[in-house]
Every structure is written in structure tokens, then in C-alpha cells.
């Protein structure tokens, strides 16, 4: 005797039962709308119809989606990044199918921003090129543009019809004040640019493991911004379907509540001040240990990193002789320097540089 077939009705019913439950545990492709609104307000200082966004897999994921968007819709299929820049920018954009070009940012010899070089390169680029800009706490140099320099960059980008793309991975880390750190983004919004922005919550909210980010676009109007976001969704769906839910709820809890937000702002200042005090301590210890090199740049720089000026050989010697690890371009994470290890680090740096 053959077994009875299961009823179709049963299958239909189970779909009805499970569908709403599944739905409750999923974010839509674009992510959590409450989080996107909070993120937009955090960066731009306001919400507006012509600013729309999607939740992303942290800063890296947002960069990749924007790179793919450029590859699909931007006629030039290239992007200018500062020299130097965060090492991962280059493969992210290359893997998205773009040609990566560099614009001058840092004067390695004099350890300061090469502003003339930057302006010359923006001027020389074809009209309508896309430029990646670090919104604050430039990684790895720790040197940001002044207000006046940002205004000049905004002017030239408007004149050349360039497309700005801000990467904001350290809001709150540069000055200790999240509002101040958003000033370049807000200036460009005020000045009427159309532009993209990717935000990471890895460092400022300590959410590295949760992959929390937001990719937003300032369109000429709401219709344009919504059309771009719809294309972002078209890229997200075949990449990872939809983003995770947990980390954004932490952000919503904090940024959606005035007293929690005030606490975050205070703690951010505390953290930025601690890093700055470690810069001073590191230099004081270097001088005390007998180093005659000029270390002024370490205290002039801001953000999480010291672009120390150590050569590749010196970095390797520090690793081999003292078990101190930093990137081969000499970038030291100041977040790892404490009152307990600062003397050891200074002695080790002096040992490999004397
Ligand atoms: N942009 C910059 C400039 C960064 O330094 C980083 C992280 N080091 C990121 C983006 C991406 O970080 P995440 O993917 O962890 O948000």
C-alpha cells in the first residue's frame, strides 16, 4: 500500500505560518530604516529627503557597494584615492572593477599635507572624476585639511564637476567631538554637492565585530537619491541579501536617545584625549631616552594613528628585536599605547632609529 501524499493544504498553511516569523527575523535588503535615519543625522546633522542610504557591512562593505555602483553607472570607471591611503581602499576598488588612481595628499619629506599637489591633481583630472576623501582622521597620515583647505577643495570639485565620495571611519576620534569631525561632510552638503558617504561604526562605537555601517547619497533631489539607493539594493541583493540586525540596534539605542548620545559624546572626548596624551608621553619618552630625531609630527597628527616616519627596515627591526608590531609603512596604532607600555615602546623606537 502506498503512503498518502501530504496535503497541499498543509504545505500552504506551513508557508503561512513560517513566513511572518521569518520576516520578523530579517532586515530588508536596505537594512534598518531607523538606523539609516540615525546615521544620516549623525553625519549630516540633519535628515533631508535628498539624503537617502542603506545599511552596509561596516565601512568596508559600503566602500565595495559604492565601488560596484561606480563600475556599473559611472562613465569613467576609475576612482582617485589619496596617496597614501588606507591600504584596503585599493583592492576594494580594484575588485569592484575600477581603475585606482592616486592624488597627492602627503608630503613625505616635510611630514605635512601636500595641499598644492592635491589641488594640482584635482585640477589636472578629467572633469567629472570621482575622488575618495577621508572625512576626518586621515588614515594613515593623521593629517586632516584645515577649514579653509576644505573650502578650496569644495570649490575646485564644484568647478570640475568631480564626484566626492567621503569615507568616514573615525567620526569623534579626530577632535573628540563627533559634530566637529563631520564638518567637511556638512560643508559639502551646504555647498550643494551631489556626493556619496560611507560611515563605519567599528572604531567610534567599538563595534568592529558587528559590521555596522551606512552608505548614503546626497542627490540633487529626493527622486535622484531614491533612484541611487534602489541601485545600491540591486547590488546588495546578489552579494549578501540583507545586513545583520544586532549592531544597528546598539546604535539606535545610543543615537536615538539624547541622554545616551550625550554620554557617548563625553566618552568619545575622553578616549580622544587619552590618545592625545599618549602622543605627548611617547614623544617625551623618546626625548628622555636620548632620541635626537624630530618627533613633532607625532603630536601634530590626530586620530587613531601616528604615521611615525619609521622605515620598513626599522619596523621590521622593532618587530624582530622588541616584538612591537605596526604596519610596514610605519603606522602605529596609538590606541595600543598605554601608560604601562609607552616607555618600552619609546626605548624600542630609539633602539632601531639611533
Ligand atoms: N575606511 C578607513 C579609512 C579605515 O581606516 C577603515 C578601517 N580601518 C575602514 C574604512 C573600514 O573599516 P570597517 O570595515 O571595519 O568599518
Question: Where on the chain are the PLM-derived regions?
Answer:
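Catalytic-loop motifs flanking and including active-site residues across diverse enzymes
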Residues: 35, 62, 209, 247-250
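Conserved PLP-binding catalytic core of the aspartate aminotransferase-like
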Residues: 263-321
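Hydrophobic beta-strand scaffold residues
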Residues: 100, 164, 195, 325-326
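Active-site PLP attachment segment
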Residues: 181-227, 231
